[in-house]
Amino acid sequence: MSSDLEATIARLQRGVVETFPHVPDSVKPEENLWAYLRQTQRPLRIKFGIDPTGSEIHLGHSIVLRKLRQFQDAGHCAVLIIGDFTAQIGDPTGKSEVRKQLTPEEVAANVQTYLEQVRPILDFETPGRLEIRYNSEWLAKLDLRKVLELLGTMTVGQMLAKEGFAERYAKETPIFLHEFLYPLMQGYDSVAVAADVELGGTDQKFNIAVGRDLQRHFRLPTVQFGLLMPILVGTDGVQKMSKSLGNYVALTESAASMYSKLEKIPDALVNQYIELLTDLPLDSLPTHPRDRQKALALAVVSQYHGQELALQTQAELAAIVTQGQTAQAGSIPEYSLGEFQFPVKLTYVLSHTKLCPSSSEARRQIQGGGVRLNGEKITDVDFTLTAPEPYVNQVLQVGKKKFLRFVP
């Protein structure tokens, strides 16, 4: 067995929670994904589906996308399914209530922003390495006969055993019939694209298993493996990363904002973040947690903003600390975002928090380059904070001596 192939497999195994089916030490390709990869003579089709239900992708979403890129780099074809059809229903996985249905126009707008955000992660250039498909290609064409055939492959009992449905059923919260179709539609995607492997978070095991069952039902020559990645804990160190909880780092954030958030994550999360969000070698990390945080922040910011800007950002933020104007929690005043009605102009925030004596002085400070938000210079006098969540734990600075930290 070549050392290059084994190194590739080791990279693909990094951070993986589970593959299924999996018979340990089996050399049969149908029983062990890693045996399959060692023996296959063709590029595999590696499926990952995303429903464009929002406008932002955060680092939690990037975990599976990075794994998809690793398969691309190993010579396989990433099949990125854009769930433009399923997004109009919404994945009920882990949800305690029915999901809001989106209009086709909302979905189309989200699709464009999603594709722009995944470009720094996936290989869009190498021929044969990426196939982008929209599941409306096949799902919009299903007639009632085919829908009934899909429904006939599962029982109500199987559906109610699914996470989210069981909880809602026990609480007598309504479960609508169209929600039962979601796992079947995601599974049918695997039939339509003839997936060899499907990637997902640990919460997607049920849906991926449905895809395996449907591939058997429709007699595909190969049945997909499932590969599950962890659900990333948010920057609060408590709950999963989520925009609604404000504990997320968006891929579209500025270099300064991204670096600042990552540099301050709890020590207990640093190693997991490094393993899942970077390619840093795990056997040669800095000993001190603070140094590991800096290595993490620099590596992640470099991915999305380039190494030059990442190094510049690191130096600028370090300079603030060196001057004794540190952004640590105990050293600067905190101000609750709950004091504002959103959206709110930055000039109002500056005057209301007494960082500036008046709105006119706030405008002058902004125009003169004296205002920074999480290390990033703000020069637009009309800059507006649209919602509180993105600004939790961010530091607002005026000049060299005035600081405050936003809290919920």
UniProtKB/Swiss-Prot annotation:
Instruction: Pinpoint the S4 RNA-binding domain residues.
Output: 344-408
**Positions of short motif 'KMSKS' region:** 240-244
Q: Which Pfam families match?
A: SYY_C-terminal, tRNA-synt_1b
Q: What is its EC number?
A: 6.1.1.1
Recorded GO CC terms: cytosol
Catalytic reaction(s) noted:
tRNA(Tyr) + L-tyrosine + ATP = L-tyrosyl-tRNA(Tyr) + AMP + diphosphate + H(+)
GO biological process terms, alphabetically, are:
tyrosyl-tRNA aminoacylation
Protein's job: Catalyzes the attachment of tyrosine to tRNA(Tyr) in a two-step reaction: tyrosine is first activated by ATP to form Tyr-AMP and then transferred to the acceptor end of tRNA(Tyr).
Task: Give the record's subunit note.
Answer: Homodimer.
- What protein name does the entry list? Tyrosine--tRNA ligase
Organism expressing this protein natively: Thermosynechococcus vestitus (strain NIES-2133 / IAM M-273 / BP-1)
